A protein has these predicted regions:
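Short acidic-glycine loop/turn motifs at beta-strand connectors
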Residues: 80-82, 115-119
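Active-site-adjacent loop/tail segments of enzyme domains
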Residues: 76-106
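Short, structured loop/turn "capping" segments at alpha-beta junctions
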Residues: 104-109, 118-123
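Residue-level signal for inorganic ion chemistry
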Residues: 17, 55, 75, 94, ...
């Protein structure tokens, strides 16, 4: 049976694969996403490019250690009126982000990369425009 190496420590991404009966093994890439994002922002990269590059970087880095397996890397960013919002580090940050998004249209960009032997096999991204409901 095919096993996917998940270049992530995300419990949500692992659960999605598990729910679809996809054998997987999480192996986080341990890249410093903030450093990569800041570098790409300085180069005026779009949110789509930032998400795609992070997904590729994660998958390619981990795949060097698992030459016989497919490695899945993924990344999501939120664009709120030109400001990139990263995933929260804790519950308080999550609440602050939700307050910031409250009642405002924002963009969710998610990218997925499949890599083998340190080289990209496939990459795709999805761009969704989402309204955030006004809190009562």
């Amino acid at each position: 049976m095919l096993k996917i190496i998940l270049a992530s420590k995300s419990k949500v991404r692992k659960r999605i694969l598990d729910e679809h009966n996809i054998l997987n093994e999480p192996k986080p890439s341990n890249i410093d996403e903030d450093v990569v994002k800041l570098s790409l922002i300085k180069e005026k990269a779009s949110p789509e490019i930032i998400s795609k590059n992070l997904a590729e970087l994660k998958a390619n880095k981990v795949s060097h250690n698992f030459s016989d397996d497919l490695v899945l890397g993924a990344d999501s960013v939120i664009d709120l009126e030109g400001e990139l919002i990263s995933k929260p580090n804790d519950r308080n940050e999550a609440l602050e982000i939700l307050k910031k998004l409250n009642g405002k249209k924002h963009h969710l960009i998610s990218s997925v990369c499949i890599s083998k032997n340190g080289s990209m096999v496939s990459v795709s991204y999805t761009h969704l425009t989402l309204p955030t409901k006004q809190a009562v």
